[in-house]
């Protein structure tokens, strides 16, 4: 069980490093706006949703995608809509002035936002199916249903750990950006997400 947890942790952490997806953009935005707790809860929500996808992929969810080519088409369409919507919101966003007070509601909303964005990003199913297929071929661990849970938990922890680390890095460097610089950065991220579609 421990090897499955550790492999999931490593795969989740390093698989989240590319800063190009919607969750990365949300975490970066919150970090630049000084909304660290909310960004942390976005990371936790996204980590949980993606960890569940990893668990399902480990359990054999890849068969659904392979057996039904329409799933891939629907996946691409849903991802395009999510990225386009986030891109538009970033283009229109105004950075928060100064430090913001974050209460329980902000944390809960951050968690739900992170979970929803990751859960409704069906390309993650395909990504984790591919990762699990490669892992299966590597024979690093045995593939038994009882190892799906520790693998999924490891992925969840690794993903959340990466985004928390990213948030801390952004938080430390945030003072170096002017309000206008943050606004420009958010618009560039929004444009990037729209063009990525």
Per-range role (PLM):
Residues 112-130:
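Selected transmembrane alpha-helices and immediately adjacent juxtamembrane segments
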Residues 2-73, 130-149:
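Juxtamembrane transmembrane-helix termini in multi-pass membrane transport proteins
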Residues 167-192:
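Interfacial loop-to-transmembrane junctions
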Residues 36-112, 169-173:
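Membrane helix-loop-helix hairpins that form the core translocation module of multi-pass transporters
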Residues 14-22, 120-124, 163:
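Short helix-coil transition sites and intra-membrane helix breaks within transmembrane domains
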Residues 144-160:
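Short alpha-helical packing/oligomerization segments
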Residues 75, 79, 189-192, 196:
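Hydrophobic alpha-helical transmembrane segments of polytopic
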């Amino acid at each position: 069980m421990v090897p499955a947890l550790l492999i999931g942790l490593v795969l989740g952490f390093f698989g989240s490093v590319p800063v190009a997806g919607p969750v990365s953009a949300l975490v970066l935005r919150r970090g630049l706006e000084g909304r660290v707790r909310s960004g942390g809860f976005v990371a936790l929500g996204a980590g949980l949703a993606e960890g569940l996808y990893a668990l399902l992929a480990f359990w054999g969810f890849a068969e659904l995608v392979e057996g039904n080519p329409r799933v891939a088409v629907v996946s691409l369409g849903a991802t395009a809509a999510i990225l386009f919507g986030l891109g538009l919101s970033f283009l229109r966003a105004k950075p928060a002035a100064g430090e913001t007070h974050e209460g329980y509601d902000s944390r809960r909303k951050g968690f739900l936002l992170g979970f929803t964005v990751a859960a409704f990003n069906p390309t993650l199913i395909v990504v984790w199916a591919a990762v699990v297929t490669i892992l299966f071929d590597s024979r690093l661990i045995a593939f038994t249903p009882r190892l799906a849970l520790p693998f999924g938990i490891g992925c969840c922890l690794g993903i959340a750990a990466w985004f928390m680390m990213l948030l801390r890095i952004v938080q430390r460097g945030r003072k170096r950006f002017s309000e206008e610089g943050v606004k420009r950065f958010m618009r560039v991220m929004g444009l990037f997400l729209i063009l990525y579609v």
